[in-house]
């Protein structure tokens, strides 16, 4: 494998600002060809805690300005006032960044009662349904365990941990922590634990989202067509999403359940911020609407514009993607060999391609720079049993 020495400060001066601040990025980086270039021309070579939060190097001009605007909207703490964002009346997070810290995953500090710090389980999402998947009356798909002042949350989450010790075949022991969740303080009828299916999820990283949205659908469908390996117990299929009269390939979120980056849904479902796609409050018809009115909330206008949401969409599409690290390390190379020996690559595909025209944002802006790229996501975009 050929190694190229790249002097970063000559090409990416804005990146060095983070390097100097944290001291964890390198000025000289070994840049291998091939699979280490995770996202084609959008690959960067940063290793600090901010590595997920930089724009791709091909971004410039008005697109770079909009990226910065979207970054601000992504991280800004929203409040309940119409001027500052329309948070609530109930919500699960107070900004995109409260769940996706620096465009990555937040590590929650879980308390046994009340969740994570003063904001409850603000870095996790709690999905509640009946055992058959149906929603409960008076509740939606997400438990909103937070609310603005004077409004009652939908419920509170508590957790109890059970630590268990196991053993690898070679005798080395390891410990796993099993959480058991309990929901209390239901605002309406209490739901019995035996009737409840509760899924507590850590939000996903937002790195590589633009490349994912630009993937060639035909390539994913071809993977599904050949993804049948009975000798390994593996099969996969595409997940198609029908919404507003259009059927599209699901790519994003848990189990490929969305065909876009769900910016509008995130504003609505997670923060209670109404928009053109979801104009109703998430607690529509619940007592929290009246409680919010008593606290001075007005529901006669949308809380965020489509233009602002598209700036957030652009920010997520145009993030740079860190390269694979330590690709020449013998231990890493041994792990890669085991990856193939275990047939992980049959599902977590190592190489994919983006379509010619790139990606289109939620309000019609096109990003052709995401097109015609060879990427190495090591990701699985199919559904499996």
Each PLM stretch: what is its role?
Residues 80-82, 98-110, 321-323, 342-346, ...:
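Secretory-pathway/luminal and periplasmic proteins that interact with or process carbohydrate-rich
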Residues 45-47, 52-66, 76-309:
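Extracytoplasmic redox metalloprotein regions
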Residues 313-325:
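His/Cys-centered metal/cofactor-coordination and adjacent catalytic loops
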Residues 43-44, 184-185, 356-385:
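Surface-exposed intrinsically disordered loops and tails
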Residues 70, 91-103, 206, 312, ...:
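The canonical Cys-X-X-Cys-His
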Residues 15-45:
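Bacterial Sec-dependent N-terminal signal peptides
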Residues 1-17:
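Sec-dependent bacterial lipoprotein signal peptides
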């Amino acid at each position: 494998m050929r190694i190229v020495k790249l002097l970063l400060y000559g090409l990416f001066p804005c990146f060095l600002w983070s390097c100097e601040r944290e001291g964890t990025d390198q000025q000289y980086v070994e840049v291998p060809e091939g699979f280490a270039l995770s996202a084609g021309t959008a690959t960067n070579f940063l290793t600090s805690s901010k590595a997920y939060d930089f724009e791709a190097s091909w971004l410039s001009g008005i697109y770079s300005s909009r990226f910065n605007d979207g970054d601000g909207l992504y991280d800004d703490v929203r409040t309940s006032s119409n001027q500052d964002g329309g948070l609530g009346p109930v919500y699960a997070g107070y900004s995109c960044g409260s769940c996706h810290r620096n465009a990555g995953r937040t590590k929650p500090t879980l308390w046994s009662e009340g969740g994570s710090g003063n904001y409850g389980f603000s870095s996790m999402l709690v999905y509640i349904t009946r055992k058959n998947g149906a929603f409960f009356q008076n509740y939606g798909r997400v438990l909103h365990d937070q609310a603005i002042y004077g409004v009652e949350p939908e419920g509170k989450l508590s957790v109890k941990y059970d630590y268990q010790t196991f053993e690898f075949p070679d005798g080395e022991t390891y410990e796993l922590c099993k959480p058991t969740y309990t929901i209390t303080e239901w605002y309406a009828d209490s739901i019995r634990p035996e009737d409840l299916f509760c899924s507590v999820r850590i939000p996903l990283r937002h790195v590589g989202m633009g490349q994912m949205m630009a993937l060639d659908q035909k390539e994913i469908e071809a993977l599904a067509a050949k993804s049948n390996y009975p000798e390994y117990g593996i099969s996969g299929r595409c997940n198609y999403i029908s919404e507003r009269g259009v059927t599209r390939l699901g790519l994003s979120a848990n189990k490929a359940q969305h065909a876009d980056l769900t910016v509008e849904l995130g504003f609505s479902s997670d923060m209670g911020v109404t928009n053109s796609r979801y104009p109703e409050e998430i607690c529509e018809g619940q007592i929290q609407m009246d409680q919010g009115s008593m606290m001075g909330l007005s529901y006669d206008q949308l809380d965020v514009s489509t233009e602002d949401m598209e700036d957030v969409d652009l920010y997520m599409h145009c993030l740079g993607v860190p390269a694979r690290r330590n690709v020449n390390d013998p231990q890493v190379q041994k792990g890669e060999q085991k990856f193939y020996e275990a047939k992980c690559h049959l599902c977590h595909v190592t190489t994919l391609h983006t379509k010619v025209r790139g990606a289109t944002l939620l309000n019609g802006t096109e990003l052709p720079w995401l097109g015609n790229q060879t990427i190495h996501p090591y990701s699985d975009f199919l559904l499996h049993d």
